[in-house]
Amino acid sequence: MQNHVISLASAAERRAHIAATFGVRGIPFQFFDALMPSEELNRMMAELVPGLAKQHLLSEVEKACFMSHAVLWKQALDEGLPYVAVFEDDVLLGKDAEKFLAEDTWLEERFDKDSAFIVRLETMFAKVIVRPDKVLNYENRSFPLLESEHWGTAGYIISREAMRFFLERFAVLPAEWIKAVDWMMFTYFFDKEGMPVYQVNPALCTQELHYAKFLSKNSMLGSDLEKDREQERRHRRSLKVMFDLKRALGKFGREKKKRMERQRQAELEKAYGRRVISFK
């Protein structure tokens, strides 16, 4: 398994955390230098996600986060990788993580590497809808289908066809359709045409900040993105008014899709309920 950890080159404390977390378990990994607001970021947006530069409801840091994932996918495609595991540098790993991340036989035995799929390794401790699937358990963890939103991109495995799917669509999406990268991957924001997202349960990883919040403790690492989002909230609310008229042009079709999705989720929730995906 190729494990890539997105991290700022200057983030010494976080990189030490990752080296210790992965190293003690013998999990191979490599850092992928996260993008920062810069001319390089602007060039990569123009090449891969041109609408993102015009999306003023996202901060520059959120755009850099989005593009760090997109550029990593493009690199994986260029290298011909069938799939890649992606992590962020504040991730915590659960029990026996090395059995999932230091080898990939389990993955190829359960998933068609030539198809589009995501295996979500992370939990955000939100109540979500998951539907049982026929994928066999591995090391006391199951792989139900994720049927509701579940934020976060701290840990996931994405196949080549899924990377290609997102990059092809990101390249043509208008600005008003673009959201934060976790919204694009793990909600019904746009039709993923049946591409499955499997939620590992119990989760194999979580963000240190959200685990600390879940335990009502103080975070040791914090979240640069969360800080940036907090600073941007007021700015977003004012900008939102400017976009309401433009968004109204395509509103009715999207609203119909949302209503259908809400109805589908209501039926699934009635059948399966909502649950917090645990971490261990």
Curated annotation (Swiss-Prot):
Superkingdom assignment: Bacteria
A single BP term in Gene Ontology: lipopolysaccharide biosynthetic process
One Gene Ontology MF term: glycosyltransferase activity
This protein's pathway: Glycan metabolism; lacto-N-neotetraose biosynthesis; Bacterial outer membrane biogenesis; lipooligosaccharide biosynthesis
Keyword DNA damage attached: no
Cysteines joined through disulfide linkages: none
InterPro entries documented for this protein: Glyco_trans_25
UniProt keyword annotations, A-Z: Glycosyltransferase, Lipopolysaccharide biosynthesis, Transferase
EC number assigned by the record: 2.-.-.-
Similarity comment: family membership: Belongs to the glycosyltransferase 25 family.
Summary of the function given for this chain in its UniProt record: Adds the first galactose to the lacto-N-tetraose chain in lipooligosaccharide (LOS).
Annotated protein name in UniProt: Lacto-N-neotetraose biosynthesis glycosyltransferase LgtE
Biological source species: Neisseria meningitidis serogroup B (strain ATCC BAA-335 / MC58)
Organism lineage: Bacteria, Pseudomonadati, Pseudomonadota, Betaproteobacteria, Neisseriales
